[in-house]
């Protein structure tokens, strides 16, 4: 599944390009959206209240709660902030097991070190 999003281009700032979103990535986004929606409801916050506190539209909040990958990460972060969950985002890629393995393999293969 491919999603279309606008990206900046030095020649044409509104040139449309397709962001490739694979099914597994979309599934992750969907789960994230559901988790955000559940967190909002557990706190008994209305969509309108979250929108008022973040400055985003209800359409954008609905997209976030549906896991729409075209919504900016900044908007996701704003909503997470209202829910008191923004710090959870700092855990992403914190424990980079694959990166460490790749780095260790390179360090072990370096000559003369």
PLM-predicted stretches and their roles:
Residues 1-30, 89-113:
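N-terminal flexible/basic segments that precede or flank functional cores
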Residues 34-49, 110-113:
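Short basic helix-loop element that most often maps to the first helix and adjoining turn
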Residues 41, 52, 81:
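Short polybasic/polar patches that bind polyanions
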Residues 74-91:
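DNA major-groove recognition helix of helix-turn-helix/homeodomain DNA-binding modules
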């Amino acid at each position: 599944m491919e999603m279309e999003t606008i990206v900046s281009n030095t020649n044409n700032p509104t040139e449309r390009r397709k962001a490739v979103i694979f099914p597994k990535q979309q599934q992750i986004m969907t789960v994230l959206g559901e988790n955000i929606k559940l967190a909002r409801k557990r706190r008994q916050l209305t969509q309108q209240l979250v929108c008022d506190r973040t400055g985003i539209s209800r359409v954008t909040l609905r997209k976030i709660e549906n896991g729409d990958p075209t919504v900016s990460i900044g908007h996701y972060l704003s909503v997470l902030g209202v829910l008191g969950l923004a710090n959870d985002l700092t855990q992403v890629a914190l424990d980079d097991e694959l990166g460490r393995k790749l780095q260790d393999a390179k360090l072990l293969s370096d000559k003369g070190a």
